């Protein structure tokens, strides 16, 4: 209860300064290996650069699904960092390799912010 109350108070405070604040959920693809989980942990802490540094390593993978997922995650990181044109480039790259099921959701979000 205290955590929820604190969240609500914090949200109210932020909204008083930034009325356009919008709560969004995002999706990150990962595989059950140490490096993927490290990147997921960094993304969960909003360390987008740290997460991207790990995902970049997967861009040379022989597995097209892993390359596509890494590109999608980089697109998400760019989107969350406010670089919408770069996010779109990475999402296009991901779609060229292997269009992921939730790609269209991220594309709509990016296009709404351009």
Region locations from a protein language model:
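C-terminal/domain-edge helix-coil "capping" segments
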Residues: 1-70, 74, 78-81, 92-103, ...
